[in-house]
């Protein structure tokens, strides 16, 4: 385990009891213990090869990483190191070092476990910047990610208060879809592909494919445009067109583990654009629709982490040079073997058609049914795995689905911006298949 160097170089601690005294010496190589919060690395006089941390008052744990004085959490609780260890229903948390938890993304054996507060205990933590501290809880044969019974230090929130219209953890009696609305303000600045929370992109849909052996793999992103409909890219499904093969998650921000409040859907209809085509690089008419239902026949239910995105007005796209958000589980480099575990977001700027059709860009490959967008510094971009996901821009004062991640050469390559399906050119197609049902909003 990677350790933090937080010990002094030399000191002597003498501990006495009624039977005599035992000398404990701080080692000159004290950093080997990885003591935190003022803890001192000591060894027994006659067993110098046995080292441990001697913790100051209020701190416990192998590395003095547990703060017994913390009875509430600040912010989203990422720095919480207290001893709460039950979910909001009182179920005990599983130890982070238990054999079953080790199969999950966050556990005590990660190289960065100490920095994340994970260790040989079952205390609530928030290693992935979710809404509040959480833990794994055993429910039947399943391990579930559950929010914890620990209050916010602000004092305005227990684990489930009455709804006041402002508290992000409260539960209103009735929530309605309001397209383009999210709990967090738009972040129209370059963020370098940083991890984000699903509340920042609550319309994002994660699409997976089932395999014959029972395994499930991530395929593409999508966007919720009405309670029952997700829009994505046809090229994601062109090789496997059986709707029964696909699963859609809303409200999910981690690739292989559940997120509190997420919803799982089967695909009732899979509609690929009839004029889709692809050449050596470009994808044409690259748009698809998925009608979704839960196993109980329900469409999506609105929440802080599940919301629809507005469709753009006809011929009313954001102006070239505008900043837009992209989000997904895409690889940082096309040569990467694995997709990142955490949902990521970055910001790009729309590139004019005239510029994108220059020979050193893409030339005639780019049509008027496409949009180009890029980071001006060519440092961030959509990449493999982001396909089908949203390009969200502010249009006429509201957030709209301006584009769908479609194609491009490499990722963040100079003079090779990402190319997106131009949604405003497919509004008639969308309405033809969706009809007047299900609350499509512009």
Curated annotation (Swiss-Prot):
Name any one GO molecular function.
serine-type endopeptidase activity
What compartments host this protein?
Secreted
What Gene Ontology cellular-component terms does the record carry? extracellular space
User: Which residues lie within the region annotated Binds urokinase plasminogen activator surface receptor?
Assistant: 36-59
Q: Which InterPro entries match?
A: EGF-like_dom, Kringle, Kringle-like, Kringle_CS, Kringle_sf, Peptidase_S1_PA, Peptidase_S1_PA_chymotrypsin, Peptidase_S1A
The catalytic activity of this protein is classed by the Enzyme Commission as 3.4.21.73
Q: What class of enzyme is it?
A: hydrolase
Disulfide bonds, paired cysteine numbers: 33-41, 35-53, 55-64, 72-153, 93-135, 124-148, 179-310, 220-236, 228-299, 324-393, 356-372, 383-411
Q: Which residues form the active site?
A: 235 (charge relay system), 286 (charge relay system), 387 (charge relay system)
PTM (free text): Produced as an inactive single-chain protein (pro-uPA or sc-uPA), is processed into the active disulfide-linked two-chain form of PLAU/uPA by a proteolytic event mediated, at least, by TMPRSS4.
Per the record, the GO terms for biological process are: fibrinolysis; proteolysis; regulation of cell adhesion mediated by integrin
The record's section on Gene3D superfamilies has: Laminin, Plasminogen Kringle 4, Trypsin-like serine proteases
| Keyword entries, A-Z | Disulfide bond, EGF-like domain, Glycoprotein, Hydrolase, Kringle, Plasminogen activation, Protease, Secreted, Serine protease, Signal, Zymogen
Domain Peptidase S1: where? 190-435
Task: Please give the activity regulation comment for this entry.
Answer: Inhibited by SERPINA5. Inhibited by SERPINE1.
Q: Which residues form the Kringle domain?
A: 72-153
Query: Where is this chain glycosylated?
Result: 152
Q: Indicate the family of this protein.
A: Belongs to the peptidase S1 family.
Subunit comment: Found in high and low molecular mass forms. Each consists of two chains, A and B. The high molecular mass form contains a long chain A which is cleaved to yield a short chain A. Forms heterodimer with SERPINA5. Binds LRP1B; binding is followed by internalization and degradation. Interacts with MRC2. Interacts with PLAUR. In complex with SERPINE1, interacts with PLAUR/uPAR. Interacts with SORL1 and LRP1, either alone or in complex with SERPINE1; these interactions are abolished in the presence of LRPAP1/RAP. The ternary complex composed of PLAUR-PLAU-PAI1 also interacts with SORLA.
Give the protein's biological function: Specifically cleaves the zymogen plasminogen to form the active enzyme plasmin.
Protein name, entry field: Urokinase-type plasminogen activator
């Amino acid at each position: 385990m990677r350790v933090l160097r937080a010990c002094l170089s030399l000191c002597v601690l003498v501990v006495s009891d009624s039977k005599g005294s035992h000398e404990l010496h701080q080692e000159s190589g004290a950093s080997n213990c990885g003591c935190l919060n003022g803890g001192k690395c000591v060894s027994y006089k006659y067993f110098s090869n046995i080292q441990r941390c001697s913790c100051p008052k209020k701190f416990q744990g192998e590395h003095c990483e547990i703060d017994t004085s913390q009875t509430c959490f600040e912010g989203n609780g990422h720095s919480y190191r207290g001893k709460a260890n039950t979910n909001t229903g009182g179920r005990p948390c599983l130890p982070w070092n238990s054999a079953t938890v080790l199969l999950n993304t966050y556990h005590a054996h990660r190289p960065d476990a100490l920095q994340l507060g994970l260790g040989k205990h079952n205390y609530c933590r928030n290693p992935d910047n979710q809404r509040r501290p959480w833990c794994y809880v055993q429910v039947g044969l399943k391990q579930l990610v559950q929010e914890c019974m620990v209050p916010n230090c602000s004092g305005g929130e227990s684990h489930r208060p009455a709804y006041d219209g402002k508290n992000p953890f409260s539960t209103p009696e009735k929530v309605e879809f309001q397209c383009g609305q999210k709990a967090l303000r738009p972040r129209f600045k370059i963020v370098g592909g940083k991890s984000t929370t699903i509340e920042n992109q609550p319309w994002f849909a994660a699409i997976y494919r089932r395999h014959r052996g029972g395994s499930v793999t991530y395929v593409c992103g999508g966007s919720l445009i009405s309670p029952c409909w997700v829009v994505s890219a046809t090229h994601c499904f062109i090789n496997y067109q059986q709707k029964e093969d696909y699963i859609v998650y809303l409200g999910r921000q981690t690739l292989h583990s559940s997120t509190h409040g997420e919803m799982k859907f089967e695909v009732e209809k899979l509609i690929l654009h009839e004029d889709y085509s692809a050449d050596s690089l470009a994808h044409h008419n690259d748009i698809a629709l998925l009608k979704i239902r839960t196993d109980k026949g329900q469409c999506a239910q609105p929440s802080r982490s599940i919301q629809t995105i507005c469709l753009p007005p006809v011929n009313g796209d954001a102006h070239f040079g505008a900043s837009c958000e992209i989000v997904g589980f895409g690889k940082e480099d096309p040569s990467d073997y694995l997709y990142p575990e955490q949902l990521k977001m970055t910001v790009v700027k729309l590139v004019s058609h005239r510029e994108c059709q220059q020979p050193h860009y893409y030339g005639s490959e780019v049509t008027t049914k496409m949009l180009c967008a890029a980071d001006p510094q060519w440092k961030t971009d959509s990449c493999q795995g982001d396909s089908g996901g949203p390009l969200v821009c502010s249009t006429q004062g509201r957030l709209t689905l301006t584009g769908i991640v479609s194609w491009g050469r490499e990722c963040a390559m100079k003079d090779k911006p990402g190319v997106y399906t131009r949604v405003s050119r497919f509004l008639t197609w969308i309405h033809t298949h969706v009809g007047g049902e299900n609350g499509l909003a512009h």
